[in-house]
Amino acid sequence: MKKIFTFALATLMAGNMMAQMHGVLNFAGASTANVLNQNVENPSDTVKFEMVNAASGNITLPNITNDNLVISSFTIANVAFTMGANHVVTMPDQTFATKVTVGGEEKNITGSSLKGTYNMADNSLTLNLTFKYGAMPFDMTYSIKAYYIKPVASAITVNVGGAFNYNNENVTYSVRK
């Protein structure tokens, strides 16, 4: 009987731990891309984070534009992280490699550095990456300070000049949490 209760308790705890693993988390914020001292700033990029397990996750970056160069969105799999004190998650400096298909051609992305933090107190994500794209001989850096956003669906009513009402019952917008 004791084994049955122990098994039931372990099953409930495992289920509770899995419930803590969220789906994809979206973070929006200002970013900077740099190649050969040419900075391109974007006031609002969205980065996605999906937990794989309690020590790693997948990070998806948006399209990165630097003058005439557009790097398609790509995912970095199994980014390692540790949970620290004061609800701060740290992604220690690590290398990465991934591929992206552009116009039917596969391009390698080789990262010499990825590091970042997620602060649960203010829901902010900071990432800094250095990588080479395809046959590009120069390093590209990408950095972003973003905040967790959550889609909210609710009706919205706008009154213009006290004379015109606009109602939309089916609107979804992202709210910074």
Question: Can you describe what each PLM-predicted range is?
Answer:
Residues F7-T11, I59, F138:
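Intrinsic-disorder/low-complexity peptide segments enriched for small residues
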Residues L9-T11, S31, N168:
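Prokaryotic Sec-type signal peptides and long signal-anchor helices
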Residues T117-Y118:
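Helix-rich interaction surfaces within compact, conserved domain-sized segments
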Residues A33-N37:
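The phosphoinositide-binding surface of pleckstrin homology
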Residues Q20-A28, N39-P43, S73-N86, S113, ...:
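Edge beta-strand at a domain terminus
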Residues V40-D45, F49-L114, V175-K177:
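Predominantly extracellular/secreted and cell-surface proteins with exposed
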Residues M1-N26:
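Bacterial Sec-dependent N-terminal signal peptides
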